[in-house]
Structure formats: C-alpha cells, structure tokens
C-alpha cells in the first residue's frame, strides 16, 4: 500500500518503480501496467521525461474506461434519435435510468440496453434483406435463395427448441460468406434510398464496434483490440472527448510505429544474412 493520492506524480512514479522491482524478481523483461485516464496521463508524462528508466514499461489505458467513455459517445450521437423513449416505453428501464445509461454512467446497463436495441434493429434489417432478395435479387438460384430465406426465418422465430435453433444458426453461418456480398449491396442500396435506414445502419455499426472492443478485452485479442481502437478514435474526436482522443490516438500511433520499426528491423536482419 502506498500512502498517498493516486493522482500525485510521486505516487504514480513509486507505483511504476514497484512494478519494475516485481518484474525483476520474477525475471521478466517487461512490466505492463494498466491505469485509468487520469493516472495514465501522469504515467505517460513520467515515461516521456524518463525514457531510459522506463523503456521496458508498457503503460495501458484501462479497457473498461475506454468502453464506458465510448458508451457516452454513442449516447451523445444518438441522444435525439428516440432510443431513450424506446427504452422507457418498452418498460426495459425507467426514465432516470435510461437517461443516465445513455450518458455513459452505467456500464452493464448501457451495454445491455444497446444490445437490446441492436438485436431489434438486426431482426428488422434481416427481414428487409429477405424481402429485398425475393423482390429484386436474380443472381442466386431459386432453390438456394429459398434455403437462405428459410434459414433466416428460422433464426428469427422465437423457439424453445434450442437444438433446432443451433442447427439452423449453424447452417446459416455456413452460407453467410456467400450472402455477405449480397447483404453489403442491400445495405448500400437501402442507404442511398432511405436516410433513415442509413442513420440506423450507422448505429448498428457503432454498437458492433463497441462489442468488438469488449470481445477483444475479454479474449485478449491484440489484433482485434488495435482494430477496434483505431475505429473508435475518430468518434472520440468528433464528440469532443479531448483527452481520450489525444491519449488513445497517441497510444495507437506509438504502437503502429513500433510494429513498423520491428518489421523494418527484421527485414534489415534478413537482408544482412543474405
């Protein structure tokens, strides 16, 4: 325990040195520390001022706080879209709770609320996709088209038979790669014809981005984490999240330069060996 304010430079510096000492005892080369934004900013300043002392220290911003702040970004973008009224009138949340979760004040409730809205929109989107395939698509054979439509309908229907639902979902996943181009074409055409479809399709993309980031944190997927963070940064900038856009963007740029440096170094070594 360190008897001091967690946001003081001396406390942050002592914490970083203690972690380094622990890594030396364990004979590990690098030490990884995760902070929230307020402490992360001070830790990075210390590392920038003492680059040689903390060259083997990796400072990460906490994924929970990034996700929580991104929830507030989503709420700000779609604050007048009717999502709050939808959550209240459907009886899912009360007035005060719905208002707070859209401001990013509650992580679990916020993720659940956006998951529910996302699920409802995806069901409507798949129904519209099925109708579009029946009305306009002539590229698929009739038999194959009917199979795809029946699988979509099976997955949409509520069923207590878990085995049949898993079977239908598995068959649908097998055919999804072939449907992907058609679905992208459908979304493009529908977005051009309807601004409302384009608006809610953007909501689907943003919530899926949040879910990808959460999945990366839970699974420890570094590539998915980098991809999700890279797509999050423009939203932080657009919604005036100055500190998050600055420090998350800076961290991402440093990681990219590090990977480029490592690739160039490997190429130089292989060239010398040849």
Give the ranges of each region predicted by the language model.
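Long, low-complexity intrinsically disordered regions enriched in Ser/Thr/Asp/Glu with frequent Gly/Pro
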Residues: 1-274
């Amino acid at each position: 325990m360190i008897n001091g304010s967690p946001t003081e430079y001396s406390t942050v510096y002592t914490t970083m040195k203690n972690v380094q000492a622990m890594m030396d005892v364990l004979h590990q080369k690098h030490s990884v520390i995760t902070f929230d934004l307020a402490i992360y900013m001070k830790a990075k300043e210390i590392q920038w001022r003492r680059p040689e002392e903390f060259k083997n220290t990796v400072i990460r911003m906490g994924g929970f706080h990034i996700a929580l702040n991104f929830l507030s970004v989503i709420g700000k973008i779609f604050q007048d879209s009717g999502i709050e009224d939808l959550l209240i009138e459907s009886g899912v949340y009360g007035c005060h709770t719905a208002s707070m979760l859209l401001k990013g004040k509650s992580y679990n409730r916020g993720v659940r609320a956006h998951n529910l809205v996302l699920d409802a929109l995806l069901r409507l989107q798949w129904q519209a996709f099925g109708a579009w395939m029946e009305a306009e698509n002539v590229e698929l054979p009739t038999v194959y088209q009917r199979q795809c439509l029946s699988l979509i309908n099976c997955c949409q229907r509520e069923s207590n038979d878990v085995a049949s639902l898993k079977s239908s979902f598995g068959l649908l996943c097998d055919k999804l790669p072939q449907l992907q181009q058609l679905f992208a074409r459908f979304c493009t055409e529908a977005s051009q014809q309807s601004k409302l479809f384009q608006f809610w399709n953007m909501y689907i993309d943003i919530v899926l981005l949040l879910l990808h980031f959460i999945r990366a944190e839970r699974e420890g997927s570094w590539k998915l984490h980098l991809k999700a963070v890279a797509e999050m940064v423009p939203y932080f900038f657009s919604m005036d999240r100055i500190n998050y856009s600055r420090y998350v963007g800076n961290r991402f740029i440093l990681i990219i330069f590090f990977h480029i440096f490592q690739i160039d170094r490997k190429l130089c070594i292989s060239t010398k060996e040849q």
